[in-house]
């Protein structure tokens, strides 16, 4: 496994440069550590009604989960890349944290992940492999009040695999839908947003390619 480094109190892959530059530029500090997308996260959390269970799909190094684990009673995070999980485990601690070594989709399978040197957050599903792919619904999570999805174009399949969870729990959802990402997989650019709306979710706002939806 490649190495890790600590920047502003946060563990990241040794090769990471993009996030380092961005986090230092923004210089947002939470609990004495550099934070990532703090304003966007706080915007989304305004629409959370209860604080029982959060789900982080594309947990990466825990940059969102560091905060979510302190706000919610339970946190479930899914991250398929071993190096990212190693960073996550250093960044996010607590008995309420559950980290799963897999990706989420709309079927069971096994996939590979392409990782980008210098910008680890740009990792995406890249064909078949040996990393487990599972459906969120198979975990039968209860009282899910918040879901964050950032899986570089794979958001729509991940949501489809969690349809029963979405309909049962009506969580607040923030989903990334940046231009060109979903199209790599032959999916509509904002297909995940349209899918959530088809289930009854209401689009609340959008910020730099991330869409926030919740149920009335």
Predicted regions and their residues:
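Glycine-rich adenosyl-binding loop in Rossmann-like folds that engage adenosine-containing cofactors
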Residues: 8-41, 95-142
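Conserved Rossmann-like nucleotide-binding pocket used by diverse enzymes
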Residues: 55, 76, 100, 132, ...
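Short helix-capping segments at alpha-helix termini
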Residues: 92-96, 166-169
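Short, glycine/acidic-enriched loop or turn micro-motifs at the edges of active sites
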Residues: 59-61, 82, 106, 151-153, ...
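Conserved acidic-Pro-Pro-aromatic motif
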Residues: 71-77, 137-216
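Hydrophobic packing residues within well-ordered alpha-helices of enzyme cores
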Residues: 68, 88, 113, 158-162
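Short, charged, surface-exposed secondary-structure boundary motifs
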Residues: 86-87, 109-110, 182-185
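S-adenosyl-L-methionine
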Residues: 1-95, 192-195, 203-216
């Amino acid at each position: 496994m490649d190495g890790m480094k600590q920047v502003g109190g946060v563990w990241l892959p040794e090769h990471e440069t993009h996030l380092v530059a961005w986090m230092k530029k923004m210089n947002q500090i939470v609990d004495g550590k550099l934070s990532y997308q703090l304003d966007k996260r706080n915007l989304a959390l305004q629409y959370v009604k209860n604080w029982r269970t959060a789900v982080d799909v594309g947990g990466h190094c825990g940059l969102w989960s560091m905060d979510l684990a302190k706000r919610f009673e339970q946190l479930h995070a899914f991250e398929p890349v071993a190096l990212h999980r190693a960073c996550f485990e250093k960044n996010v601690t607590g008995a309420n944290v559950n980290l799963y070594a897999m990706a989420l989709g709309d079927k069971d399978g096994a996939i590979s992940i392409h990782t980008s040197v210098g910008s680890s957050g740009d990792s995406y599903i890249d064909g078949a492999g040996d990393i487990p792919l599972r459906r969120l619904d198979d975990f039968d999570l209860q009282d899910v009040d918040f879901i964050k999805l950032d899986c570089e174009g794979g958001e729509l399949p991940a949501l489809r695999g969690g349809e029963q969870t979405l309909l049962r729990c009506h969580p607040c959802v923030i989903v990334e839908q940046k231009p060109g990402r979903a199209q790599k997989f032959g999916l509509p650019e904002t297909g995940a947003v349209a899918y959530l709306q088809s289930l009854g979710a209401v689009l609340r706002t959008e910020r730099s390619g991330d869409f926030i939806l919740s149920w009335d």
